[in-house]
Amino acid sequence: MSSPKRQSPISIDPYAQNGFGVRFEWGTNGAAAISAGASAMIVVDVLSFTTTLSVAVDAGIEVFPFRVRDATAATFAATRGAMLAVGRREAADTGVSLSPLSVRRAVADGTLKSSSKLVLPSPNGATVARQLAENGVPVIGASLRNASACANWAVRAVRGPIGVVAAGEWWPGESLRPSVEDLWGAGLIIDALAAAGAGPMSPKAAAARAAFRGVGRNLAMGLAACASGLELANDGYGDEIAVAAEVNVSRKVPLLTGESFKAA
């Protein structure tokens, strides 16, 4: 019996999701893989960077994403005339941190105004956004709060493939931990992109959409029960989860222009 003939090899990047109008991947490496040829990239970090970003942009605040919270971030903030978000414990009840509630409090008490600038460090969503911006692709910061607004804006504003990147979290040792809250957020955005006419979806994008549809009405419960939600609750910040679960309450689209996010 003769052995099967080997098919002629094809020349295609198996990771780029070329040929699909809606793409989906994880983290910085995934963002790099699917951004080539994309007309826009949407970054999702539900707990908490893009949720906090949406709260800030709703209030008219200009937000500078930054990779780490260290001396370089402080210098960067000073040269931009911006406030630097600090750690949650350092912020306590009065400072501004990565917590969306801290931004709401600061807006309510006048610490942050519509003319304010805020440097918001995050090893996840901010890092992905800055990397993509350095590559010259338009970047949108989306969460559950503004998923439909971001998707609709992207479909209207660009012609070509749209990539959605779930930022994910990190395991000890610096390896990516895919986080289900970002999968759900990406899935909602992909669902909204499809409803607005974008497509076709890559298999990975379709899987993310199915994950969001699968959680359905149990989304808020799922956010509280997932690993990232439990981490926040264990540290005493479980009340932030309700802000992340405010589905499609915002019509503002955070667009990264140069170094900072502003409402599109």
State where each predicted segment sits.
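Extracytoplasmic/secreted cell-surface and envelope-processing proteins
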Residues: 51, 172-175
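Short beta-strand segments
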Residues: 43-44, 85-87, 120-122, 142, ...
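Catalytic cores of nucleophile-dependent amide-cleaving enzymes
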Residues: 133, 143-172
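Short glycine- and acidic-rich boundary segments immediately preceding or forming the N-terminal edge
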Residues: 1-22
